[in-house]
Amino acid sequence: MMKKMLNLWNKVSYELGIFLVVLVQFITTRAYDVDAWSAPWNVLDYSMGNGSRLLVGSIYRLFYGDYLDQVEAYRYNCVGIIIGIVAVSLVFGRMIRMVIAYTPEKRNVTVGMVILYLAAPFSMSYLWNNSNIGRLDTYLFLVGMLSLLVLLCIKNIYVKMLLVTVLGVAGLAIHQAYAFVYYPLIVAAMCADVFGEYKVNVKNLVMAVISGVVEIAAFLYFQFGGGLYYDHPQQVVEVLSQRTDLPLPTDSIELEYFRDITYVQNTLLRSFFAEEKPFLQLAVVCVLLAPVLIIYVLMWKDVFAYNKREQKKLFCGPYVYVLLTNLVFIPIFAMQTDWGRWLAPLFAGQIFIFLFYLAKKDAAMYYAASKMWERVKKAPLAFAATIMWIGTLDSFGARSFQQQAWAVIYFFTHGFHQ
């Protein structure tokens, strides 16, 4: 009996440990009200239109029937977050086990990177703070984690790409932002199948391209082909007010469904760049997260050093293309003001990529992991200090990037006075 229990524990120990840590984070730090700006998407569904941002509300309606009060809406969002916690626990657990299976000596560096993620302000904890709880980002994160799990666990390329494509379309149906904030991570992971062992696998490349074309077509449809069956945002509010007591800001509905990009550029973006100093906020965030950025830079330095040492053709491997996927974030930073929501997956992506390629037995990433562990053994206190430092930082917000970054800016512009 004890042996069976021990075997069971060995099968779930990493996943359960990660799940419990993140669950405690969620229970103890979550906000208690759904974000007001995004509240309408809890009740908007396909009976009111077609296109993006209506899928989640349609699923919710299968359970609540005719009326969704604030308490029930909050519960639904919490359930979505907990499912996301399960998904990220399975992803990290699978990665750790795959690494240990072929290189047990890399266990410490693998677990260390997971701990780094869990402590960081760009971990999934950003999904439940005051700025973001109740947003559709919860489900974008979930789709991203499920896609990574597919790429990790399924070997058949046709089944793998089919599932990733279906999940990608679902992500776009949830919110078009999936194309910019989580799909780049999935493309970076797909490069492991296309450029494995420094040679192009034509079959895998064709499947990846087909998947990408479908995603682009779906994005264009959801971005430009969908809409609501109403002529004015106030009409939408009147209908929704019969279904819920959630806040229903007319501005959010008007901006998303009744205004074009020119209006956004001439009003929101102009004032955002002029008044809220986004590049200054970004610079301060980078300073606060400098220890993490140094880890990332050294990681990629080691990857390319391995390529040079082994005289590998750079563009025959996946690494340049993996780095280029980060450029896909640029349009959403240029078109939207909620930079905190986009920075979190951008920063977190490097950890997922490192662990994914390590789990896939990538030689260059294996070399980078070895060098990383050498540095940790030489300066263990530096790594411990990094974990403790980033653990003190608040999770990323939305339009206000990160609390400590704004506090630093405010101090240097206003001193001690309000």
Regions found by a protein language model. Give the residues of each.
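Membrane-interface transmembrane helices that cradle and orient dolichyl/undecaprenyl
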Residues: 145-161, 193-199
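Perimembrane helix-loop-helix junctions
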Residues: 182-210
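Membrane-interface alpha helices of multi-pass inner-membrane proteins
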Residues: 161-176, 181-187
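Transmembrane-helix motifs of polytopic, lipid-linked glycan transferases
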Residues: 82-104, 150
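Transmembrane-helix signature of polytopic, membrane-embedded enzymes
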Residues: 95-122, 158-161
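Short hydrophobic/aromatic helix or loop-helix immediately within or flanking a transmembrane segment
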Residues: 46-82
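Membrane-lumen/periplasm interface segments of specific transmembrane helices
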Residues: 22-26, 30, 204-295
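Membrane-interface micro-motifs in multi-pass membrane enzymes
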Residues: 49-53, 108-152, 174, 334-357, ...
